[in-house]
Amino acid sequence: SIMQSSSLVSIISISFISAGLIGLGQGIGIIFGANIGTTTGAWLIAGLGLKVDIATYAMPMLVFGTILMFQSDKKTKGIGYILAGLGFLFLGIAYMKEGFEAFKATLDLTQFAIGGFKGLLIFTFIGILATVIMQSSHATLVLIITALGSGQITYENALALAIGSNIGTTITAVIGSLTSGLEGKKLAGAHVIFNVFT
């Protein structure tokens, strides 16, 4: 949840397994936890970001976060990094909301909506591709939720994009496991299976 990157946690877990620091069961537990933890950002955005003008909270968080980042105490510095990160996240969400709202007048993305099984496959692939390019399922989910909240994509297509995002985040772990031992490959496989079925 703190790292907001299940891909990074997966790669670290595969490295730890390859080095013999943890077992396969522990690695699977870490990956499951990382996958659940990454959803906190999406819940935060869905709960606050689309209902409240979070840009008003972003600037004070950035100011106080920046001030605290330059303190000598490690705890204070850590709080500063967290505040600054949340401030940038909130500001980014606010700008994305404004961007999608501006799109409404000139471009209606719902005209590209595709229903049925064909739409599910196409938008799942787009979600996978977007996540692989951005290297963050969290960033992809932020875009999906923001676009859905502004009415730019249909609910059905948003679900397919989210599924693709969830699957796309496993590709980094699969690539990282290619040079690892058998246990690392098993962990990457567990990561893929977990994300495909959840």
What are these regions (language model features)?
Residues Q26-G33, D53-M59, K77-F88, A188-N195:
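Cytoplasmic-side transmembrane-helix entry/capping segments in multi-pass membrane proteins
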Residues S1-M3, F125-M134:
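Transmembrane alpha-helix interface/packing and boundary motifs in multi-pass membrane proteins
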Residues I54-I67, T124:
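Transmembrane alpha-helical segments of multi-pass small-molecule transport proteins
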Residues I82-L129, A147:
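Helix-loop-helix hairpins and the membrane-proximal interhelical loops
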Residues V9-G37, A42-A55, T131-G168, S177-E183:
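Membrane-interfacial helix-loop connectors
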Residues G20, K77-G85, L109-K118, T131, ...:
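Membrane-interface segments at loop-to-transmembrane junctions
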Residues I45-L48, F64-G78, S180-L182:
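Membrane-water interface regions at transmembrane-helix termini and the short interhelical loops
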Residues T40, N166, T170-I171, V192-F197:
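Hydrophobic transmembrane alpha-helical segments of multi-pass transport and channel proteins
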